[in-house]
Curated annotation (Swiss-Prot):
Catalysed reactions listed for this entry: L-arginine + H(+) = agmatine + CO2
Species annotation: Nitrosopumilus maritimus (strain SCM1)
Pyruvic acid (Ser) modification, residue list: 44
Keywords for the protein's UniProt record, in alphabetical order: Decarboxylase, Lyase, Pyruvate
Cofactor comment text: Binds 1 pyruvoyl group covalently per subunit.
Family to which this protein belongs: Belongs to the PdaD family.
Enzyme Commission code: 4.1.1.19
Protein name, UniProt field: Pyruvoyl-dependent arginine decarboxylase
Gene3D superfamilies linked to this entry: Pyruvoyl-Dependent Histidine Decarboxylase, subunit B (3.50.20.10)
């Protein structure tokens, strides 16, 4: 039986601009370094014992035509100057034998920090609930983060986000963020 549990993963992001919507997505994938691969979108689990490696190291381990399992976020606009973002949030448990969470989030009108924090918040909330850590969705991010720190169960949260404004001439603008799992 195939062991398809990822041992490593890396984060990447990109943006693309073109008159054609699909081509702008292709350019975003090129900017992210993974255009020459076949992406398979999967659900949002950070595998137990998986190691987060650098983008550079991850890109060195892939080859053209390879099937890549990814959790990704993509957002597109052809409205001039419209702010758009795509983000993937990560929440890792302290116990490396447990799985963590990855979350996808797209937004219009948010800064890179706002979108990234929200994606991170989603992943952390999913992890907290799976670990039985109580949380109040109405608390602000800093209060929730403090609650999770006190529990001692959540090791690390982070995100990768690509944010830009729509092309001034109305060309399609795509933003893309991904966690790429390497099996």
């Amino acid at each position: 039986m195939l062991d398809l549990v990822a041992k490593k993963l890396f984060l990447t992001r990109g943006k693309g601009i073109h008159e054609d919507r699909l081509t702008s997505f292709e350019y975003a994938l090129r900017d992210a370094g993974i255009a020459g691969t076949n992406l398979v979108l999967i659900s949002s689990i950070f595998p137990p014992k998986a190691k987060l490696i650098s983008r550079k190291e991850g890109l060195q381990q892939i080859k053209p035509g390879q099937i890549l399992f990814t959790i990704y976020s993509k957002n597109q606009t052809n409205e001039p100057h419209r702010m758009c973002s795509a983000s993937v949030g990560i929440a890792q448990p302290k116990d490396k034998d447990r799985y963590g969470y990855l979350s996808e989030y797209e937004a219009f009108g948010q800064t890179e920090t706002q979108a990234g924090d929200y994606a991170e918040d989603i992943a952390a909330q999913m992890l907290a609930s799976s670990l039985g850590i109580p949380f109040d969705v109405d608390k602000n991010w800093d209060e929730k983060r403090q609650q999770w720190k006190i529990s001692g169960e959540i090791y690390k949260t982070q995100n990768i986000t690509q944010q830009t404004r729509g092309d001034k001439d109305g060309k399609w603008t795509t933003v893309f963020a991904a966690a790429v799992l390497l099996v």
